[in-house]
A protein has these predicted regions:
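Loop segments that connect adjacent transmembrane helices in multi-pass transporters
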Residues: 129-135, 208-256, 324, 331-332, ...
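ABC ATPase nucleotide-binding domain helical subdomain, centered on the C-loop/LSGGQ "ABC signature"
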Residues: 419, 427, 434, 452-495, ...
Length: 594
């Protein structure tokens, strides 16, 4: 556990570590304040029990003489107010520093979530094809919450109680070494035995909690994402059973962890009170009838016990809570390491200025996906002239979409070179190249926002250029439909565009690509899921840009690529033929069958 904590703090930012070290100084101040409050009561109680102490040698006599008070009881009265003031100041200091501890831990948790979110968004397309969005969401929302409330906060509180426990023990050690050492041995051995016995169960529960949180996230994502199929196929009961089953496992693991953390408290309180009774009996037996001497001694041990027992329980509780949630850190450990590496390796865009007329050239492009034996692309070479319309056809799995992902910079090939107007496409100029591209996929992702927010995707509402929105909606043949809506471009589209037809979604996708004034438009089977009439309407909108922009189209149906200047036919990751629509019809039998 200690190695994990050290590693975790090594992955924090320098600013976060500085804040942590500052808090340790505050914890020392809080410890002094609490110790002062504890041991200010002891001399006061001794004086109340025996006012004659003022006549004996000691610091109370010095204070009494300097106070110029003529009555011992007046001195005791004012001393009581001083002790009360010390207690109030100590409480205020503890409240403030405890608040700072909580704010630090929660702030760190939020910042870790922010870093993870930013890290995942900055990862390449291949990363997201191999990762579950439910898993990423669960890490950002649930695991960072666990790190905040079940890892960092307990750690902060444990540190606070450790400082107090050590300081009080040192004072008691000076006051009575034998009793202090005996108490230390008894309490330490008891807690160590409990922690050793509970460790294995806590580790199992920790992993179960992470697994069940992820399972419930996945079930929610799958059931809500496919709600139409769930309702139609009457599968809601199966999802509910799985969700409840995972929830019961989660509740059992979390409940058992809490019980392991809380139950020993009563056993330790029993030991604590038994020790106090034994101490009282021991002091009575050795007081020789002078019970008045016992009051200050009992006061110091009683007050120390009141502070130490909860402190020891807090330390134990924190250790158990941290051990029971180490899986939360383990689940994001690799990501935090990668984040630090990303910061060191960040690539600056050189702001390459591409010409308006972009000739796209691919030379000997080869690529295969991780953990796949066969090549997705194999020695592909082609040239796309500016402001031409090209199509890619082929059976499923022939490499069409992968090739487009290479052209638009989502995938980096293992071999070969891509050039734009003769300039190699590299990391430093990739961003500016992608700024010139608009893509219309087969399935248009729509947020649960307005039409204008979906057209100007990713732009805050107050920064949207509504004139540009209206312009591109007109180009996408959506103007008439939008004008017929009560709220126009401010109309909501529903979650994932559920209130729109397939054709309307595709047109919004086209408008989105045009909003950013892209010079290259990519249509990735954009009409394959549409009926014939709607497809013709969409193709009319697309064909309006012929000769004005570079159009790249992936298609299954040949009707989509009839007007292309050039068509590339693909099979098994290679270009097996190319030509115009009419040329391929004449010379390629496979093309005719498509």
């Amino acid at each position: 556990m200690i190695k994990t904590i050290i590693e975790f703090f090594s992955l924090l930012t320098p600013s976060q570590r500085r804040r942590f070290y500052t808090l340790q100084i505050l914890l020392v101040i809080m410890t002094f304040a609490e110790v002062a409050s504890i041991f200010s009561i002891t001399p006061f109680m001794a004086l109340v029990g025996d006012p004659s102490i003022l006549q004996k040698e000691g610091f109370l006599r010095i204070l009494y003489e300097k106070s110029n008070l003529d009555e011992p009881y007046k001195f005791i009265f004012y001393l009581g107010f001083v002790v009360l003031a010390i207690l109030i100041i100590s409480a205020l200091i503890s409240i403030f520093i405890t608040w700072r501890l909580a704010m630090f831990a929660t702030k760190i948790g939020v910042e870790i979530g922010d870093r993870l979110y930013s890290h995942y968004l900055n990862r390449d397309w291949l990363f997201h094809t191999m990762k579950s969005s439910s898993n990423l969401t669960e890490k950002i929302s649930t695991e960072t919450y666990r790190i905040t409330h079940m890892f960092l906060l307990p750690l902060m509180y444990m540190n606070a109680r450790l400082f107090l426990t050590l300081f009080v023990f040192l004072i008691l050690l000076v006051y009575d070494p034998i009793v202090s050492i005996i108490c230390l041995i008894v309490f330490s051995i008891t807690y160590i035995i409990i922690i050793k016995l509970a460790r294995a169960r806590l580790e199992i529960n920790s992993k179960n909690i992470s697994a069940m949180f992820l399972e419930r996230f996945k079930l929610m994502s799958d059931s809500f994402g496919g709600i139409k199929e769930v309702l139609l196929l009457d599968k809601s009961s199966e999802f509910k059973k799985s969700f409840i089953k995972a929830g019961n496992k989660l509740a059992y693991s979390e409940g058992l962890n809490r019980a392991i953390a809380l139950v020993p408290r009563y056993f330790m309180e029993l030991i604590g009170f038994a020790s106090m009774i034994a101490l009282v009996l021991y002091l009575i037996a050795n007081s020789k009838g002078n019970l008045g001497l016992l009051l200050p001694i009992l006061s110091i041990y009683a007050i120390a016990g009141v502070k130490l027992l909860p402190a020891l329980q807090q330390i134990y509780n924190s250790i158990v809570t941290i051990q029971g949630n180490l899986s939360a850190y383990e689940s994001i450990r690799e990501d935090l390491i990668n984040i630090n590496m990303d910061i060191e390796q960040k690539v600056e865009d050189n702001q390459q200025v591409w010409s308006k007329h972009n000739e796209i050239s691919l030379k000997n492009i080869t690529f295969n996906y991780p953990h796949k034996k066969s090549f997705a692309l194999k020695d592909v070479s082609l040239v796309i002239k500016p402001n031409t319309t090209v199509g890619f056809v082929g059976t499923s799995g022939s490499g069409k979409s992968t090739l487009i992902d290479v052209i638009i910079g989502l995938i980096k090939p293992q071999q070969g070179e891509i050039t734009i107007d003769g300039t190699p496409l590299i990391s430093q100029n990739l961003r500016t190249w992608q700024n010139k591209i608009g893509i219309v996929p087969q399935v248009i992702f729509l947020t649960e926002g307005t039409i204008s927010e979906n057209v100007a995707f990713g732009i805050p509402q107050d920064l949207i250029n509504h004139e540009q929105v209206k312009k591109v909606l007109k180009l996408a043949y959506l103007e008439e439909w939008v004008l017929g809506l009560e709220n126009g471009v401010h109309s909501k589209v529903g979650e994932r565009g559920i209130q729109l037809s397939g054709g309307q979604k595709q047109r919004i996708g086209i408008a989105r690509a045009l909003y950013y004034e892209a010079d290259v438009l990519v249509f990735d089977e954009a009409t394959s899921a549409l009926d014939g009439i709607t497809e013709k309407a969409i193709m009319r909108a697309i064909n309006d840009f012929t000769g004005k922009k570079t159009l790249i189209m992936i298609a299954h149906r040949l009707t989509t690529v009839q007007k292309c200047d050039k068509i590339f036919m693909m099979n098994n990751g290679s270009i097996v033929d190319s030509g115009t629509y009419q040329q391929l019809l004449k010379k390629n039998e496979q093309f005719k069958k498509m």
